Amino acid sequence: DKGCVRNILDIGGNTGRWAMQCVKYDDNVEVTVLDLPQQLEIMKKRISGQKGAERIHGHSCDILKKDSPFPSSSYDIIWMSQFLDCFSEQQITDICRRAAGSMGPDSRLFVMETFWDRQKYETAAYCIALTSLYFTAIANGNSRMYHSADMIRCITDAGLQIEESIDNIGLGHTILICRK
């Protein structure tokens, strides 16, 4: 049931801003933020004292270390927002495979990205393509803005299926809803 979300895993949750929005929206939602230990400390300080902060939990994980475990709970939703574009295709497949291990039969993985091929306007696609060049040449040498077919292939190679694809969210995002 899409309307009965109680337990969310936010992978790469950063400052906890999205997690705070979730707990403010629904008093029955619990969110676990999976991120690096130092990032979780920043998140805890940022959300401290805010209404609903007691329903946000941290799970320390270095996503690139395959022996760093994901939570074993079965989550209703696993959320990755503009996260997978930070990794190579093989790393994306590995991350999605590990996320699938935290999914039950009714769980869904939501992947939100800006795919250059799904943009409404040609100029937006061009800007996203240039962002990819920046990541590759200047930033970390690994990140890039993906064509949606490449991301979908990584997700399906991880053993997941695309249940739904929603384009034109906000200023050009796409959400891929995946299941086991």
Residue ranges and their predicted role:
Residues 2, 9-180:
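Alpha-helical subdomain
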